[in-house]
Amino acid sequence: MSQRTRLSVNVNKIAVLRNSRGHGAPDVIRAASACIDAGAHGITVHPRPDARHIRHDDVIGLSTLTRARGVEFNIEGNPFAEPRAGYCGLLALCRETRPHQVTLVPDGDQQITSDHGFDFAREGPGLRPLIDEIKQWGCRVSLFVDVNVTGLADAAIWGVDRIELYTGPYAEMHHAGCSDAVLREFATTARLAQDVGLGVNAGHDLSQTNLGVFLGAVPDVLEVSIGHALISEALYEGLIPTVRRYLDILDSVNPAVSMR
């Protein structure tokens, strides 16, 4: 069975806008539902310990929505961030909701956004038991990684299903008009992952401007997770039309790719 690269819409920024006024508008669940209406294949959230955007009740509501609508739910986050008041911890959230995919990300509490991937040599021993636990819940496990990451074969042995390529460096180079070299590095990393049986996702600073070029150069990307750019563009174009524009890019660039 095969499919084109899938689009998972990150709705964190909807929650940022809602939280800025302290009430329920805009409604995160309604926004996610609109994205699904437009054809999005999944919804992504990245809850933070400080609840700066997505909150526990959002995760529960989105889990219910995605299962009812038959699309994937992807929860991202740092598995090493300690639980605290208002945040039960990433693993507890995933245990409760059993998302289709859990993407582990090594971000610190004070980071504005994710900006690097895991160092497998240093962090692998801590990740392995967490991967085992998450897999027991029936969730697919993806690890957020930098281009040129080493240790992909080890990740496959640990039971990791996919990696998510951190595409921030590509977006910067594309904006500067000099992305050819870094695209070759991303393509090489993707092939190395696929050679050891890992599926490849991608995300961070992807936009309508740079997505097509990336997918044209990097082979067999299974899923892109896009939030900030998509929500920003939707302010001008509308949410449903914007999601459809991204789907048009996926359809125009990608032949069908094998699912892993």
UniProtKB/Swiss-Prot annotation:
Catalytic activity from the UniProt record: 3-amino-2-oxopropyl phosphate + 1-deoxy-D-xylulose 5-phosphate = pyridoxine 5'-phosphate + phosphate + 2 H2O + H(+)
Active site residues of this protein:
46, 76, 204
Q: Which residues form a coiled coil?
A: none
**What keywords were assigned to this record?**
Cytoplasm, Pyridoxine biosynthesis, Transferase
Which CDD domains does its entry note? Answer: PNPsynthase
- Which GO BP terms, alphabetically? pyridoxine biosynthetic process
From the Swiss-Prot or TrEMBL record, state where the protein is found.
Answer: Cytoplasm
Q: Which SUPFAM superfamilies match?
A: Pyridoxine 5'-phosphate synthase
What class does this enzyme belong to in the EC scheme?
A: transferase
Q: In chain numbering, where does the site feature Transition state stabilizer fall?
A: 164
Q: Pathway involvement? A: Cofactor biosynthesis; pyridoxine 5'-phosphate biosynthesis; pyridoxine 5'-phosphate from D-erythrose 4-phosphate: step 5/5
According to the UniProt entry, its GO molecular function terms are: pyridoxine 5'-phosphate synthase activity
**Residues the record lists as binding 3-amino-2-oxopropyl phosphate:** 10, 21, 205, 227-228
> Binding positions for 1-deoxy-D-xylulose 5-phosphate?
48, 53, 113
Q: Which GO terms describe its cellular component?
A: cytosol
Q: In which domain of life is the source organism classified?
A: Bacteria
Q: What's the EC number here? A: 2.6.99.2
In the record, the note on similarity to other proteins reads: Belongs to the PNP synthase family.
Record text on subunit structure and interactions: Homooctamer; tetramer of dimers.
Its biological purpose = Catalyzes the complicated ring closure reaction between the two acyclic compounds 1-deoxy-D-xylulose-5-phosphate (DXP) and 3-amino-2-oxopropyl phosphate (1-amino-acetone-3-phosphate or AAP) to form pyridoxine 5'-phosphate (PNP) and inorganic phosphate.
Protein name per Swiss-Prot or TrEMBL: Pyridoxine 5'-phosphate synthase
Which gene is the coding source of this polypeptide chain?
Answer: pdxJ
